[in-house]
Amino acid sequence: MDSSKKIIIVMFLVTFYMFSCVSSTEFEVGGENGWIVPKSKTLGDAFNQWASDNRFKVGDTLRFKYTKDSVLVVSEEEYKKCKATKPQLYSNNEDTVFKLDRPGLFYFISGVSGHCEKGQKMIVKVMETESSTESPPPSSSSSSSSSSSLPASTPKAKKSNAFKTAVQFSSSGFVVSAVLIVSVFGLV
């Protein structure tokens, strides 16, 4: 095989491998319970606890499932005051998907009067890079409760399927690439 064909094949394989490593995850906010008002004041920081138990990267999505409620993306000041005058996003369609399109902090609150004050709010930190080891923002409450009305370790949603598929595809892509490189260059 001439060298130009080998170069084209190697470039194709490298490109294929790079695309196979890219994946995004959809997180279901609050796990099975969804976007609800926490049941008690002691659980008022449950959404921030849920967010801190997960790692978010650019391209991931958050799915908010709720009934007779809404979700707003707001500024830090509006988050602290539980009052939004100019939300960046307002949705009340009972199934909102929000794409995390940049690194940094995102602030979410319920748009229903009184819900935010009862703890239906959340800060999500999106990592700078996949290799970053920074932690999401700490809970805004000084009390740390080990029990929560939201499953702490459940990023529920499509994470298990999407992540599993992406990892399988990445592994398969790597193996196929390695076999093709070995066969193209006659290394065996």
Curated annotation (Swiss-Prot):
Residues 1-24 form the signal peptide. Mostly expressed in leaves and flowers, and, to a lower extent, in stems. Residues 127-157 are annotated as: Disordered. Keywords: Cell membrane, Disulfide bond, Glycoprotein, GPI-anchor, Lipoprotein, Membrane, Signal. Residues 129-155 have a biased composition (Low complexity). GO terms for cellular component: plasma membrane; side of membrane. It comes from the Eukaryota. Residues 25-128 form the Phytocyanin domain. PANTHER family: BLUE COPPER PROTEIN, EARLY NODULIN-LIKE PROTEIN 5-RELATED. Belongs to the early nodulin-like (ENODL) family. This is Early nodulin-like protein 5.
